[in-house]
Amino acid sequence: MCGIVGIVSQRNILKFLLTGLNHLEYRGYDSSGLAVIDNNNKLRCIKKVGKVNVLEKAILNKKMSFLGKTGVAHTRWATHGPPTENNAHPHISGNIAVVHNGIIENHEHLRSKLKSYKYKFNSDTDTEVIAHLIHWEQNKNGGSLTEVVKRVSRMLFGIYSTVVMDSNNPNILIAECFGSPLIIGLGICENSIASDQLALLNLSKNFIFLKNGDIAEITNSKIRIWDKFNNKINRDTVQTKISLDINKKGNFKHFLKKEIFEQPKAIKNTLKNRIKKNYIYLSELSGKFNKTIKYIKHIKLVACGSSYNSAMVSKYWFEKFAGLSCNIEIASEFCYRKIVICKNSLLIFLSQSGETADILSALRLIKKFNYVFSISICNTPESSLIRESEISILTHAGVEISVASTKTFTTQLTALLMLISHICYIRKINEKSQTDIFNAIQILPNRIEQMLLVKNSVKKLVKNFSNKKNVIIIGRGELYPIAIEAALKLKETSYIHAEGYAAGELKHGTLALIDTNTPVIVLVCKNKLLRKTLSNIEEIKSRGGQIYIFSEKSIFFSKSSNVNITKLPFVEELLVPMAYIVPMQLLSYYIGIEKNVDVDHPRNLAKTVTVE
């Protein structure tokens, strides 16, 4: 993986391929490359390690022409083999060029087979296996490129997508979609394909989303699609509302900072049209969901990464407000063990991108079980998760470019809180909690704005952390998962090893890590757990730990040489998880900047993880 672009046109397409790659960089990358069939029907390929601008400079310095009307391009995030030019895509076998996302699980067996046919491998990738296999099948058994790709697809096992180009058939691309997303962009005398519609927004506003098992034949004037049963089929065309403007930083130096400061607006957009006169109502959940909601006795949430941390917060809420038992599953574990799903369960799938392979596998897996209903909560309107779910709740945070989740995390929590209120409303239970959520959630954007004002206080702490190798973050109640999310942000954006713990668990092993060189961040709010958290602070102080407290202004702490206190504005207890993550996001950002980390594109990470 990570990003595919392909174009068939009547005009030269080099600049559009490069633009597409630039729009895919946010998904994660370590190298990039492109191949075009030039105006003499010769296959021209170039690959480089690093950012797309490294590839652009190399193309400018090359004497050979990369002008052509058919081409493919790719940004790579390494899964098989290190980031090298040989491992970058496209991969070439004679007249065949292939770009690929996903993993071919039986590539070692196929590699051995191809070596016996005297094929030589220049890379460590599973993608080169596909290129050689298509070349071998084409030469051995003949047929159109479409027929050859169909036959080869039956030899491959895994979740993947590919786009194939043949210099002997210069006006056609063949795409296959087996669990990893591909989107066709429709143009005039030009058609395109990509793994993300952002790559094609400068070419089209009209898209076809391929379904699992689809194989598509793309020319500059026609699209033909076959489904997994090899039936020729028409797929719906969708007109997107996404604008290229979202891909701009505005007055901010980094997308990460921009997205942190966009959170009040993102939350307002998530609340829009969902606040009625005196209650919260999610129109997406009308009809069958509202009729069956009375049968729900259990909640199961499935998520990865930051979405898993937001699910952890919501567990407290589901049990406290809706009186429903709740458990949380890591998607990558959920699919590979014997699972038990109660027939009176509501299943909730959380994803920022809606393309995370583990989440999609989990969603597809549960369809064979007996349960009441499933819902997805997602930020990407036209994603695979949205299209495959029974019902979806969109968070409307706007496109998030930085790899580290910020506004999608807080809007996801907002959506979960609204869902809980909606369930209480339909079931006619806990009117007080409904009122509390209704009143609090409307002032959440304002509370986030106030929390952003602590940026200067947070910035003063940066040098105390930037040279540290380890950081411990603790919290109680809903602040425990926020401590975990804060630790994840530090890992991602500053490369500091950080761990979030439940404060009460310190004495069960973590106290052994406390020393004068390990900062301990303590998240404190004024609630019934305050006294216990204060006791934990004393435990750390007595062992010489360096303590950094983030707490509401009204809480008093005795002065101590090894304690630093950052005072936070008042926030309602219900809104503490969404509000308290903000200073942690800011701290992670400023430490990353101090350490000269590429905070928008941290090393080794991808925004959209399309492999399991």
Swiss-Prot record:
Originating organism: Wigglesworthia glossinidia brevipalpis
Catalytic activity of the protein: D-fructose 6-phosphate + L-glutamine = D-glucosamine 6-phosphate + L-glutamate
One Gene Ontology biological process: UDP-N-acetylglucosamine metabolic process
Keyword Cell division: no
Record-listed E.C. numbers: 2.6.1.16
Main location: cytoplasm
The UniProt record lists the keyword Flavoprotein: no
Protein's name in the database: Glutamine--fructose-6-phosphate aminotransferase [isomerizing]
Recorded GO MF terms: carbohydrate derivative binding; glutamine-fructose-6-phosphate transaminase (isomerizing) activity
Active-site residues, Swiss-Prot/TrEMBL: 2 (nucleophile), 607 (for fru-6p isomerization activity)
Residue span(s) of domain SIS: 289-429, 461-602
Coiled-coil regions, chain positions: none
PANTHER family: GLUCOSAMINE--FRUCTOSE-6-PHOSPHATE AMINOTRANSFERASE, ISOMERIZING, GLUTAMINE--FRUCTOSE-6-PHOSPHATE TRANSAMINASE (ISOMERIZING)
Glutamine amidotransferase type-2 domain span: 2-221
Pfam families cross-referenced by the UniProt entry: GATase_6, SIS
Stored CDD domains: GFAT, SIS_GlmS_GlmD_1, SIS_GlmS_GlmD_2
UniProt subcellular location: Cytoplasm
Keywords from the UniProt entry: Aminotransferase, Cytoplasm, Glutamine amidotransferase, Repeat, Transferase
Function: Catalyzes the first step in hexosamine metabolism, converting fructose-6P into glucosamine-6P using glutamine as a nitrogen source.
Assembly with partners or alone: Homodimer.
Gene that encodes the chain: glmS
CC annotations in GO: cytosol
